């Protein structure tokens, strides 16, 4: 995850130690990267692991449905850092945990960030295949 962050900042021209630029880029999360739609997702704090897995699949379904309609998304973990403020501002119940934000809109394919490609671990490194 750290490598992805530094790769992203490199694309944006932000070097290590450039605190002001790093903070400015991080703050863009809280404007949903200028997307026209921003969503905050929450989950009841008593729900356990299986529910979190279901929630992840639910979020992925939104991402896939958006793409099928010509839209793009950006899932944003940064929102969970400020869960107390978000809960108060949105009037959310104390039992809800802020999971993430999701920006939704049309991608700017000329933006450097949208040219980023992350390294992927080959499936054989984390999966075991067996013959039936």
What are these regions (language model features)?
Residues 1-132:
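Acidic, surface-exposed loops and disordered segments
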């Amino acid at each position: 995850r750290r490598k992805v962050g530094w790769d992203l900042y490199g694309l944006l021209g932000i070097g290590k130690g450039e605190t002001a630029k790093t903070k400015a880029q991080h703050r863009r999360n809280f404007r949903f990267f200028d997307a026209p739609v921003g969503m905050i997702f929450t989950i009841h704090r008593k729900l356990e692991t299986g529910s979190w897995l279901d929630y992840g699949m639910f979020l992925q379904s939104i991402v896939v449905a958006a793409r099928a309609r010509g839209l793009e998304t950006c899932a944003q973990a940064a929102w969970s850092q400020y869960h107390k403020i978000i809960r108060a501002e949105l009037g959310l119940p104390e039992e809800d945990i802020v999971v993430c934000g999701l920006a939704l809109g049309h991608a700017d394919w000329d933006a450097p960030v949208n040219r980023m490609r992350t390294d992927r671990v080959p499936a054989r490194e984390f999966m075991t295949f067996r013959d039936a």
